Structure formats: C-alpha cells, structure tokens
Amino acid sequence: DHSSDEEEFETWFVSWVRTAFKARGNKKAIIDLIAWSENIASKGRETQKSFLGYCEDFFRQAMLLNYNAKELVYLQPVTQFELAKFAPFIHGNNINSLIEELQTAAYHIERNGNAKIVLTDLSIKLTRLLHTKA
C-alpha cells in the first residue's frame, strides 16, 4: 500500500544512510554524498521538503524499534532494507539532533536556500550523527 513517492523516498533514504555511514574517513563516499545531494537538489522544493519529513518518520521508526516499542512501528520497507539492523544506530544520543538537522534543512530549503549546499551539509552531519555512540 505504498505510494510511488514513498517508494522513491525510501530508495533515496536507504542510499543516503548507507553512503553516510561509509563516509567517515572515506573520500569516495563523501563524493557519493555530494552526488546524492545534487540529485535530490534537482527535484522540486516541495519534493525535497516532503522527503525530509519522510526521513524524520524513518528515523523515529528506527528508534522505536531500537527501544522495543515494536507495536508502534508501522514502517514496512519495500526495498531490501532491514530496519532491525539499522535501528541500533538511532538512539537517545542522536535522535534529537537528527530530527533538528532535518527540520533546519527543510526550513532553509523553504526559505530558498541552495538545496545542494543544504543537503550536502545535512549529509555530512548525518555521517557524524550515525556514528554517535548510544
């Protein structure tokens, strides 16, 4: 019961977090993050903002799963992405910062910020936040 937007968003999200996770000290992955940012920046502003909202939901769902609140988890990935393997990386020490950074990025995009720069900056922050210890 997924919309085509959700499927596309999930594909973008999975690619983004996998690349960001590898990017720490990895020059090629940083270049891939910039390319990812350029791709998303080429979409319309409303699509970018909707995608960032989708990311917020995805991170929240992962955290709920991490804290064993399985009955609150409604996200069913359509890709081969395993939420259960991703969940341990989203916890109390990074969820607030992740949500805050996503909201700030959406605000900057809404205020006509350069999407490529906003998304590249967000991607670099994501790399750091994914490696935050629980």
Q: Where on the chain are the PLM-derived regions?
A:
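Charged, glycine-rich active-site and insertion segments that engage polyanionic ligands
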Residues: 1-54, 58-134
